[in-house]
A protein has these predicted regions:
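Surface-exposed interaction/gating patches
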Residues: 85, 94, 101, 179-201, ...
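Haloarchaeal acidic low-complexity proteome signature biased toward cell-envelope/secretome components but also
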Residues: 2, 7-9, 20-23, 28-32, ...
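Cytosolic Rossmann-like ligand/nucleotide-binding regulatory domains
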Residues: 1-50, 194-253, 260
Length: 263
């Protein structure tokens, strides 16, 4: 069965007898003894975890001591993590496919992380005055700093593309052998996607492409409380409008269908 379609949970990797299967697809068969890494909502993960392991899923306990500022700081770190992960994905895509557009998105994402880092620092300093043990926030600070380093590294990866440097022949050969691509698409005024959700149009079913991020053409439509014009890991309920930019992964054939759908 299609696990992601039915549950909203994606298996992002499988560890099997000391080896790793990264980015498994609908054809991948799970075996006894496999260790699957899952990504999805807590509700979805709970059901899939119990189905795979036969054991009850126990979500981690939230910290007993919290405040509004600490909640904002933690939300910022989570968003920084999501944005930096996306930046790394796009940076490799920019180099592999010599795609200026993807490299430009990495530049935008790196700036987003820098802005989030500044907000995170302000909220963490405020939170430190409200908790009994400010030293307990050290791990959060280290995580945010590491995430910012990752986004900087993503920009370094894509800088060659931004400067117009040619890809190495080995990279070009790797691209020819790979069936999966990553690309960006602007939603046009006449696109069937404009004014509708990803689920309404069944983008993945129609094209085989998975939309991994949306950059809002109008940043005032950013998700409430997210402080960014990006929607990372959008779901079926994510509404699109003309001017939005989609980042999607899939096959070359699917990419051609995506061009038609967004035009």
């Amino acid at each position: 069965s299609n696990l992601e379609t039915e549950t909203g949970v994606r298996v992002i990797a499988i560890r099997r007898a000391g080896d790793w299967l990264t980015d498994p697809d609908a054809e991948t068969v799970l075996r006894g003894g496999d260790v699957a890494l899952l990504r999805g909502s807590e509700l979805g993960v709970t059901g899939v975890y119990e189905k795979l392991s036969g054991e009850r899923y126990e979500p981690p306990e939230p910290p007993a001591e919290s405040s509004a500022d600490l909640e904002r700081a933690m939300d910022s770190v989570v968003l920084m993590k999501d944005v930096s992960e996306l930046a790394v994905d796009l940076a490799y895509g920019a180099v592999l496919f010599d795609d200026d557009g993807l490299a430009e998105e990495v530049l935008d994402l790196e700036a987003e992380v820098d802005a989030l880092q500044s907000r995170f620092e302000a909220w963490t300093l405020r939170a430190a005055a409200e908790v009994d043990d400010p030293v307990s926030l050290r791990g959060l600070v280290h995580l945010a700093a590491a995430t910012e380093v990752i986004s900087d590294a993503a920009l370094e990866i894509s800088e060659g593309v931004l400067r117009g440097l040619d890809s190495h022949p080995v990279i070009r050969e790797a691209v020819l052998e790979s069936d999966e691509i990553i690309a960006r698409y602007a939603v046009g005024e006449g696109s069937p996607l404009a004014g509708r959700t990803l689920g309404d149009v069944a983008v993945k079913t129609q094209t085989g492409m998975r939309v991994i991020a949306v950059r809002r053409g109008d940043e005032s439509r950013a998700p409430t409380g997210k402080q960014t014009g990006w929607v990372v890991s959008p779901g079926p309920e994510t509404k699109l409008d003309a001017g939005d930019v989609l980042i999607a992964k899939g096959t070359r054939t699917g990419a051609e269908r995506m061009v038609e759908l967004t035009a």
